[in-house]
UniProtKB/Swiss-Prot annotation:
UniProt protein name: Tetraacyldisaccharide 4'-kinase
Pfam assignment, any one: LpxK
MF (Gene Ontology): ATP binding; tetraacyldisaccharide 4'-kinase activity
Pathway: Glycolipid biosynthesis; lipid IV(A) biosynthesis; lipid IV(A) from (3R)-3-hydroxytetradecanoyl-[acyl-carrier-protein] and UDP-N-acetyl-alpha-D-glucosamine: step 6/6
Length: 325
């Protein structure tokens, strides 16, 4: 079981200070790499449809998956034809790019990809090479906008809009890896189109074995439960359950962990509540104690207004370019 080092989220720490020279070196490498793309020394794949990148500059969960679900479905509801590309982290398929379906195996395409596909009404392709994923998507589906899930640092994929998500831990101690949680310097946020705070709303709690069996949130008050989370920021999940009144026995696992039945061998009969990403990998277990806690992204109205105005203009501009207008 792994979690982010505590010193990443402390303003001052001995270990953070010791590692700061390595962070400085890391920043230099990141800036050089990005600069090579900016001046054309490394190739950027460009496409005839808008590419919207959703990501973050920190290691760990920032609510990307619920946000991408909301964005894909909202685009579809507004008459667009979205598609999603992702790395498919944790997937071990022999062939990529690979189209994700509702019946895809998380072991093959990754847990986040399977969760996304079960909750969005649009095509999705996974591949470590994001450009190859977009080519495969556009070759096989008629999409007019592509969402790049967790692609902020993948500069080989051209982009028209960038959305950076920030979670409740913000930027931690403000240092880059390994002294802090930042993948890129915090100044990177000045270059994206939107910075959106992570906000999740509880949706429902249902039993994995029988999804029709649900627990009302009021029933959680004073109830002792095992909370199991193999996500980037498990503390946020535990805090949500505590806010609803539950007495939480926390079990943080490493991100993208694949569970075994013995992981749930607790010496009591308390309910076991999982995140949606974890539940995807536990449906094969015949255990009536297993429940899933589903959430929805809450997105600011101002972002919605600005984003859909911009994306509409970009689509019209690209269409005019294709037609030579």
């Amino acid at each position: 079981m792994l979690k982010a080092p505590r010193f990443w989220y402390q303003p001052r720490s001995l270990l953070g200070g010791i590692l700061s020279p390595f962070s400085f070196l890391y920043q230099i490498i990141v800036r050089i790499r990005r600069g090579l793309y900016a001046v054309g020394l490394k190739k950027i794949s460009k496409f005839p449809v808008p590419i919207v990148i959703v990501g973050n500059i920190t290691v760990g969960g920032s609510g990307k998956t619920p946000f991408v679900i909301w964005l894909a479905n909202e685009l579809k509801n507004r008459g667009f034809r979205p598609g999603v590309v992702s790395r498919g982290y944790g997937g071990k398929a022999n062939r990529f790019p690979q189209t994700v379906t509702e019946n895809s195996d998380p072991l093959q395409v990754g847990d986040e990809a399977v969760l996304l596909m079960k909750k969005i009404d649009c095509p999705m392709v996974v591949c470590r090479d994001r450009g190859a994923a977009v080519k495969h998507l556009l070759r096989n589906f008629q999409c007019d906008v592509v969402i790049g899930d967790d692609g902020l640092q993948h500069y080989s994929l051209g982009r028209d809009l960038e959305i950076a998500l920030i979670d409740d831990r913000h930027l931690g101690n403000g240092r880059c890896l390994p002294a802090g949680p930042l993948r890129e310097p915090k100044s990177r946020l000045n270059t994206v189109d939107f910075v959106v705070p992570k906000q999740l709303r509880p949706n429902e709690i249902y039993q994995l074995k029988n999804p029709a069996k649900k627990i009302d949130f009021n029933e959680l008050k004073e109830l002792t439960v095992h909370a199991v989370a193999g996500i980037g920021n498990p503390g946020y999940f535990f805090k949500q359950l505590e806010t609803l009144g539950a007495n939480v026995i926390a079990h943080p696992f490493r991100d993208h962990y694949f569970y075994r039945s013995e992981d749930f061998n607790f010496d009591d009969d308390h309910l076991i509540i999982l995140t949606e990403k974890d539940a995807i990998k536990c449906k094969q277990f015949d255990d009536e104690r297993l429940f899933c806690f589903s959430v929805d992204a809450v997105v600011p109205d101002q972002f919605q207004n600005d984003f859909f105005r911009l994306i509409s203009n970009i689509i019209l501009r690209k269409q005019a370019q294709r037609e030579g207008i």
